[in-house]
Amino acid sequence: MLLAIDVGNTNTVVGVFDGDDLADSWRVRTDPHATADELVLLYRGLLGEHRITGVSICSTVPAALRELRRMVVRAFRDLPVVIVEPGTRTGVPILIDNPKEAGADRIMNTLAAHHLYGGPAIVVDFGTSTNLDVVSARGEFIGGVLAPGIEIALDALASRAAQLRKVELTPPRSVIGKSTVEALQSGMIYGVAGQVDGLVRRIRAELGAHATAIATGGLASLVVKESETLDRHEPHLTLIGLRLVFEKNI
C-alpha cells in the first residue's frame, strides 16, 4: 500500500492507496512545530494494520517537511520514498516565468486533473487560499490565480470589524441575509462561488475553450452546489497526483 501525504498550510491530508484505489484517508491539523518523534506516533496511530510499501509526499510548509523527512527515515527507512520538489520527475511541464514558484500541490493537482479528465482544465482548490490552476490540453501547468481562502477572509473580517465575529460556514436560508450571521455566511459562500464563477469564465474566454473545472480541497463541498461553472468535484485530487508521481519515479 502507498502512503500519500499532502502537507498544506492549515491541514495535512493523508491517504493510503491499494493499487489505484484510495483505501483510507484522514485530515489532520498541520503542526510545523511537531517533531519527528511526534509524527512517528501520529502516523503509526493512523495507519494501524495498513501495510505500507511506499511513501509519496508533497508539502507547502518547509518547516513541517524537514521533520516529516526525519519521520520517514525512522518509520519507513527501507521503503521507496518520493518527495515532490525541484528535480522530481512529474511529467508536468511548468510554463510560468519562474517554475520554482509553482507549489508542489499545484503540480500534483495538474498531473491528476489531466490524468482523470484530460485538458484543458481548471483546478479550483479550496484551501487556506483559493487556487485556480490552469492545465493546457497537453497537460502543462500554464499558470493560474491565487486568492484568499474562505476561512482567511472570514478571519480577516472578524479581526478587523468590531461588530463582526466568526460564524459557522453553512449556507444561509437565502442570499439576502436576515441577520449578521446569515449575511456573513452569504458573503463567504455565495460570494466565493460568484468569485470562482467569474474567474473560471474569464479563464475559459482567455483560453478560447471550455476547460473542465474541477473542485478540490477541504472547503470545496461548501461551494460546489452553489457554483454555476464547476463541472467536477474530486476531493482527493492531490493524493491522486501523489500516487501518479510515485509511479513515475519508482
From Swiss-Prot:
Pathway: Cofactor biosynthesis; coenzyme A biosynthesis; CoA from (R)-pantothenate: step 1/5
Pfam family, one: Pan_kinase
SUPFAM superfamilies the UniProt entry points to: Actin-like ATPase domain (SSF53067)
Chief localization: cytoplasm
Cofactor(s) the record lists: NH4(+); K(+)
List of residues binding ATP: D6, V7, G8, N9, T10, N11, T12, V13, T128
Family matches, as InterPro entries: ATPase_NBD (IPR043129), Type_III_PanK (IPR004619)
One GO CC term, this protein: cytoplasm
Keywords, comma-separated and alphabetical: ATP-binding, Coenzyme A biosynthesis, Cytoplasm, Kinase, Metal-binding, Nucleotide-binding, Potassium, Transferase
EC main group: transferase
GO molecular function (one): ATP binding
Annotated family: Belongs to the type III pantothenate kinase family.
Protein name: Type III pantothenate kinase
